[in-house]
């Protein structure tokens, strides 16, 4: 197995442990600076944190960023 594949497999295995970058809660959000805050949670693309409706969610079903 080459190095790239091993790295990707390792990344996939460790992602659930970080809960999609929610590590920012441990130190007030400054772990990776502004980039980290903009990235938000990988799974919800930051919409829920910003309380915005994601584009794929009908406005009538949207409640504070959650569908």
Swiss-Prot record:
Signal peptide from the UniProt entry: 1-20
GO molecular function: toxin activity
The UniProt record lists the keyword Transcription regulation: no
Subcellular location: Secreted
PTM comment text: Contains 2 disulfide bonds.
CC annotations in GO: extracellular region
Tissues in which the UniProt entry reports expression: Expressed by the venom duct.
Propeptide, residue positions: 21-48
Predominant localisation class: secreted
Key words, A-Z: Cleavage on pair of basic residues, Disulfide bond, Neurotoxin, Secreted, Signal, Toxin
Disulfide bonds: none
Sequence similarity: Belongs to the conotoxin L superfamily.
Comment block on domains: The cysteine framework is XIV (C-C-C-C).
Entry protein name: Conotoxin Cl14c
């Amino acid at each position: 197995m080459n190095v790239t594949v091993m790295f990707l497999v390792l990344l996939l295995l460790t992602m659930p442990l970080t809960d999609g970058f929610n590590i920012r809660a441990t130190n007030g959000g400054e772990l990776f600076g502004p980039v980290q805050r903009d990235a938000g949670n990988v799974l919800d693309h930051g919409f829920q944190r910003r309380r915005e409706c994601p584009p794929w969610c009908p406005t009538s079903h949207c409640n504070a960023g959650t569908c």
